[in-house]
Amino acid sequence: MKGIRERVYHAWKTGTYPSPATKTLGIKILELSEGHSLVEMEVDEHLHNMSSTMHGGVMADIADAAMGIAISTTISPEEDFTTMEMKISFFRPHIKGPLRAEGIVAKRGRRVAFAEAVLTNQNKEIVAKANGTWLFLTG
């Protein structure tokens, strides 16, 4: 789907959601600049696993969103992209309240990009870190 960069900037400016997945999870864009994003979601019991902590897959989702949104600031209108691979390391559980993810483009090439995300809780403690690789699609 073309025009991703424009849709992401529009979502940030209007306080709307850039994709159905981010809308479902309530992920909002707080900051956006070239190669950088800061997103946030509110966590409560409906996002918990059987241990009554935030489900790791949902943490991976906000990390993927932060990195993908950061990458979207670097693409041309003719480009699209997709996640090739992603790794996440969990440092502490998150139970309730806001969770932020900062996405940073570490390296942007012609065909692939590498990005990182740091997830923090309301006390600014690191909850998880992620990194991944994205493939650019053209024509």
Feature roles, as predicted:
Residues 1-139:
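Terminal targeting signals and extreme-terminal segments of soluble enzymes
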